[in-house]
Amino acid sequence: MATLYDNEAKIKQAIVLLQKVVNDTSVPRNIRRAASDAIRNLQDPSLSPAVRAANATAILDEISQDPNMPSQTRISIWNVVSILETIRD
């Protein structure tokens, strides 16, 4: 069973990767907005780590199909989703 510390470390890692997407001006605005929303969900202290990860994954999964997304951004989003999918309560 994953410890809370492990989950929080994974969430912090995901936030760092998403922050890079948000700060990249070559990424379309709607994708940056979705990444910001995912970060906000990940930082919500009222929810358990698994729920925060699931909420963020839902946002990122939806936006990952955008045809306007640059390839390197899509790969970053997939990496974040992979990290978040390992979070369990």
Curated annotation (Swiss-Prot):
Pfam families: UPF0147. Gene3D superfamilies: Ta0600-like. Belongs to the UPF0147 family. It comes from the Archaea. Coiled coil: none annotated. It comes from Metallosphaera sedula (strain ATCC 51363 / DSM 5348 / JCM 9185 / NBRC 15509 / TH2). This is UPF0147 protein Msed_2034.
